[in-house]
């Protein structure tokens, strides 16, 4: 974890003191999801992306290796009936407290130039009953709120980057003092993500447009 990522560390401090709070009130000066000209920052000093699964985790415990073990799949996989997940592990520097995922934003992101925010860390999800282990890395959120990542299946890459989810009901904009850029939205399963996962399981387990998570992305603006 980069210690100069003040926004991410502040989020962790708030979490430790008060539990998971609703960060959505931070976005007060939003713009349409097409991102009006001049609102996307050129440079940032870090920040965080918070992913809150839209479903309830039925049981949650901590395994010896630090993984969170539960009977329901979590981000970015929605629960799959008949396919219990045994371990969901946040890959450092991402963390998974209280069933919510926090990813630090790479402070070297240049959203106005590259069109996205790079996230640090990843997630692994294991389905031992099916002999399936999935890892999701190299996450990024584009300036419209769509989510991308690379997927590894049982240690083998299933290809290049794919779009995991489409943005839905996105509210995007700068804070009134222009020091923060926020994306607040709901993520829904993309066609290519559903197709890729269904091939891995050999069955239709994901449906396009399924809700995955609510997202609060807060980036600290330099200029």
For each feature predicted by the language model, list its residue ranges.
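Predominantly extracellular/secreted and cell-surface proteins with exposed
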Residues: 79-160
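Intrinsic low-complexity/disordered segments
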Residues: 4, 23-25
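Bacterial N-terminal signal peptides that target proteins for export
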Residues: 1-10
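An exposed acidic His-Trp-rich patch
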Residues: 135-191
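Bacterial N-terminal signal peptides
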Residues: 10-19
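N-terminal segment immediately downstream of the Sec signal-peptide cleavage site
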Residues: 25-112, 181, 186-223
